[in-house]
Amino acid sequence: MGRASRSAVLRRALLLLLLLLLLRTTTTRALGPRISVPLGSEERLIRKFEAENISNYTALLLSQDGKTLYVGAREALFALNSNLSFLPGGEYQELLWSADADRKQQCSFKGKDPKRDCQNYIKILLPLNSSHLLTCGTAAFSPLCAYIHIASFTLAQDEAGNVILEDGKGRCPFDPNFKSTALVVDGELYTGTVSSFQGNDPAISRSQSSRPTKTESSLNWLQDPAFVASAYVPESLGSPIGDDDKIYFFFSETGQEFEFFENTIVSRVARVCKGDEGGERVLQQRWTSFLKAQLLCSRPDDGFPFNVLQDVFTLNPNPQDWRKTLFYGVFTSQWHRGTTEGSAICVFTMNDVQKAFDGLYKKVNRETQQWYTETHQVPTPRPGACITNSARERKINSSLQLPDRVLNFLKDHFLMDGQVRSRLLLLQPRARYQRVAVHRVPGLHSTYDVLFLGTGDGRLHKAVTLSSRVHIIEELQIFPQGQPVQNLLLDSHGGLLYASSHSGVVQVPVANCSLYPTCGDCLLARDPYCAWTGSACRLASLYQPDLASRPWTQDIEGASVKELCKNSSYKARFLVPGKPCKQVQIQPNTVNTLACPLLSNLATRLWVHNGAPVNASASCRVLPTGDLLLVGSQQGLGVFQCWSIEEGFQQLVASYCPEVMEEGVMDQKNQRDGTPVIINTSRVSAPAGGRASWGADKSYWNEFLVMCTLFVFAMVLLFLFFLYRHRDGMKLFLKQGECASVHPKTRPIVLPPETRPLNGVGPPSTPLDHRGYQALSDSSPGPRVFTESEKRPLSIQDSFVEVSPVCPRPRVRLGSEIRDSVV
């Protein structure tokens, strides 16, 4: 293959790469929200609480009556009134709890950052009973736990007046950056965290109890886990087999059963029985019911896995019917690092979870660390199961009475072979979700699950699950950019959502139906909280069929606006009541813009001039932003209307009647009528009616940047390929240039002494050539034969050697001859 053919192949390959990259950039689309509300907008009521010199608001707890919100931050706790504390100047209770000086000093000595790490970060804030709260903090890498008296909101003290403090090891993480989970069940604390300073001793434990229990560290039941959530499911209610209540833990860990070139992260669900007391001889004070299974969340088309679990919300609408419990999980993928990291929302049913735990086991070979499916007979009672009626029939009423063979089997069979499969609800390529809260909302005709999703850049997405997809209702910027949503807490009875971040806590109403002024907007929002009354959009929960003058309208699944909004009168949101259009006064030969702000991101604009669609001309043009660019002239005036089109429904957004007025007339009219609406952006240098390029219907700026980047990349590749193909010639060229650049040096003249050779033969009659060594070459007359006496210098001074610092072969003078030496 010649050089020309190779260059042609390279060009074709580069063109193919360019085409693939362009196709990739144009086909990747994200599922976006219908409405976007920026930070500080008046369209959405968002109240924020922040205390001076306090940061890292991580722990949230709502009282049973919903009137008090307890907040845990860095070295401080707060009791907020849900109605007053979020108002400017509202009152609240504050409890300072900082790590003492000794702990901070020891933390600093151990190599931790004194300002960042050696503080007390509140990680646990839970109700212990009707009078006290349980709280735990990192306490400068030496975790502590304390009790808060609810009535006075102070730390509980003993009879001597000292604050009651307990060691938080095994209950609270040492590092504030470590993820952990905790919950209280019947006064007992169940936690999933690390119990060592180095963070290499993870454990699922039970404390605050007369029967402390934990996982066995020596058996490697947990592999570097990151706990995200835990849940209590009362499975004993209505159980025909007499089952026990269970506590579920959700986390991500290293999957030892997979053999890849890198550590594979796996999402897990683990469970323990509430009545587990450990074994009598084997697994003493260790869980005898610990089992774990893999949570599988992947794309249905190609099976791409989302294997990193970020958060789980347990939805149990009816505690009496725990079988309908749903687990909503937020997942990301470890293979999205370095690019825009996407997220996936998957839902797991209680039936799928139980099916995995009732299936086959995996067994690990301790010598080879190989995992395989256990196909041999399983001992009875079933290892890892709670004490049921079948066990009680065998006189086994407690885990302390379990046979040793059952517990020994559990040591190596704690991982289930089956996976907990899910249903993918939402795939979001352009947002990283971190927290989730779910509210089951009763609509006018059905019940819907509304998801509140917190992102890593301070946004909140509100979405509703439909029969075939998930519709993102709105997007709220609740925190500044760069501040992730650290926690979400839903007050379903009060209709409020609380979110926390590094800078504070915000209170967001779950719905704002007044944001939708027309019947079309109200129905197209697909918000289960809202319904159209015939004249306004109101909360659907306020609907009383007996008192309403007409039935309210709501269509979450279909949003059939054309049929349901026929009899509803609507008006443009920017029209003055009683006038067909908005009067706009412009000056001659000026460039003016007519705004058309759409409420929905999913709608498109249609500009109409005197009943006909606007076409690009010298006098008007639609900008990429959707606004209309208008040149002030007497030609082409009339009525300009902007229509919003969404899912086939068209409604008027704005209507303008521009009027060109001379400056003198305009000044007189201003003095007489007040201040009219004048839209003037800039003057044009072209004459009135002349053609000028004011913009384009579509902007290709992003495509232009992509093409420029790819062109530069292709040129760099071609240049590197050229250098590679001619590397030998370049080396020779550089070598010759370096040798030629060396300046000749003046060689000292050495006069040999006038002595005769020992053999008595006189010197040759041919005159000696005294040219310098750089003037000699190998093309000179052939070498002459020297005698042994001539080869040997007459004296040490007769020999002269000089080596060039660049050229590798030195020149050597032997007697009267100068030659290249071979080194």
Curated annotation (Swiss-Prot):
Gene that produces this protein: Sema4b
InterPro entries recorded: Plexin_repeat (IPR002165), PSI (IPR016201), Semap_dom (IPR001627), Semap_dom_sf (IPR036352), Semaphorin (IPR027231), WD40/YVTN_repeat-like_dom_sf (IPR015943)
Mitochondrion found in the keyword field: no
UniProt modified residues of type Phosphoserine: S779, S780, S804, S816
Pfam families reported in the protein's UniProt record: PSI (PF01437), Sema (PF01403)
Source organism per UniProt: Mus musculus
GO MF annotation terms: semaphorin receptor binding
Oligomeric and partner information: Interacts with GIPC PDZ domain.
Glycosylation sites: N53, N56, N83, N129, N397, N512, N567, N615, N680
Record domain PSI: where: 512-582
Cysteine-cysteine disulfides: C107-C118, C136-C145, C273-C386, C297-C346, C513-C530, C596-C642
Residues annotated as transmembrane: 704-724
Membrane topology per record: Single-pass type I membrane protein
Residue ranges annotated as Extracellular topological domain: 31-703
Record's protein name: Semaphorin-4B
Superkingdom classification of source: Eukaryota
Record keywords, A-Z: Developmental protein, Differentiation, Disulfide bond, Glycoprotein, Immunoglobulin domain, Membrane, Neurogenesis, Phosphoprotein, Signal, Transmembrane, Transmembrane helix
